[in-house]
């Protein structure tokens, strides 16, 4: 009988052995014969299933399967033009009852998405013993590879420190790594969730209120090594406690340690300190008297509770004193009741009982009666009851002084806690110090301790000012005074007093009219208001230059001169030659040169301190017709006549040590000709000094030339007639 099989099943099989325990799909017997059948050289075949979803009892050819999968793969990940929406995912059956998982798909913005929230993907694993590279291509087509190393490939990877952009760090093998792009491990500001660091994170000293502080700053703030020291007051930091003499006087910056609730808003510094100690829940504090040496969280929002070291609260253990924790910080804040080692006593075979009856020996306190099983003398031989007492005070008067607790020698006060940073003390001085154990490299940024003053509204800083030492080690140093408006984010104004003596201002003023100069000046000195009319000089700013041994010195001062009484002050630049260093005064008053800027006459004059005005700087008078009235013609003959009256003389100035003979006119004589030819000035001595008015003289000289010109023209005309 032929054994060529052509049943329903159908997957091509070059060699199949069918046993009683394994049958070809759809075949139970072959020509009615069961058992082992050798199908070598035979095959089974079946047409492709027509249904869209095939059942287990149906089969499919290899071509059918490939033709079915290919469109799905192409549509999911490799869709080509003209298709645009590439959002069909490549899915897989999920585990643990999840129907399906979106493993990978191409999104409309041309990125590859792995997993999805809707599919409950719990994570993506990348298995690599080497490195994973992220390849970026810029606009010019240049590719840059950014590797992500596994610890197996780079075991030192966990030792890499955090670093700022543009800096260079070294890994544990000494290799230099340049940081030139922002990332999670180079910009801590990008961390939006709670992160636990397993290695120390190096940061600079905090500057702003919300900056992370360094260990050095934390130690300094608590008064540790190198911390703040103050003369004239207790050098306790916030949270430190000590024993005050009496409740009759508790300083304003302290609170008693009575286990009371405090408002967090009223004691922000102490609450900040309490949080460093991990305060417990208030319910635990109240229910467990042995936890009352700790801070509690109060109501959890607005209050907190201080330790009850004075034993004031109901049920608290009283009369507490402190002791060290023996190196176990877990015991900190735990309260202990009175305790002492037990005292035992025994005296065998010294008490006699009758008939071995119990209770025949009287006992008191710590003494207990125990009946021995040993025989004693027979009855009637003179045995007696013996009673005994134990009284420790008979050996030392220490015993019995306290009825309920073991008490060492002590005195009683009241425990208090430093709650505020403010203080008041006479003759107080203090230091605010930042310190390093060793010299820092040249150029390292350094800051001294910060002294800060604030005005706070509703718990938020509004205005603040500070003074702080800052600079770069061995390069630059200054003391900075800062004033800032935090609420409205107005830029800080700072004054830097440099180590080389310079004073720098960092903030510019807005230009305004000169009439507003009293309120719009970088450096404004105190106003000098006299209670009565006064004459004298006030120097605003000045400084000396010269030789320290006494010669060639000059002190230059800008100030104001009031003279005479009841007159407007005049701006003056004063130069004091060869002044005395110890007193700052000029022993020879004549060697002083003053330049005056008159606010009334607009004149600039120069003279010495003896009252002599030597020069008056000329100025150009305004001659605009629009500023004049009553304009009339005036003959030039008067000008020529006046010039002819002037007596041209020689003279020597009184102050001129060289006695130089000069030529010119005498002001008093010109004043007699025409008062407009001279100007009068008051000296320091109150006398008038006359000076020639060059402007009037020049104009009259021009008029005289015009008069002479007319006379020449008349004479020329007469000569022409002859």
UniProtKB/Swiss-Prot annotation:
Keywords: Late protein, Viral tail fiber protein, Viral tail protein, Virion. InterPro entries: S74_ICA. Pfam families: Peptidase_S74. GO terms for cellular component: virus tail, fiber. PROSITE patterns: ICA. The keyword Chaperone does not apply. Coiled coil: none annotated. Residues 623-719 form the Peptidase S74 domain. It comes from the Viruses. It is found in: Virion. Its main location: virion. Probable tail fiber protein. This is Probable tail fiber protein.
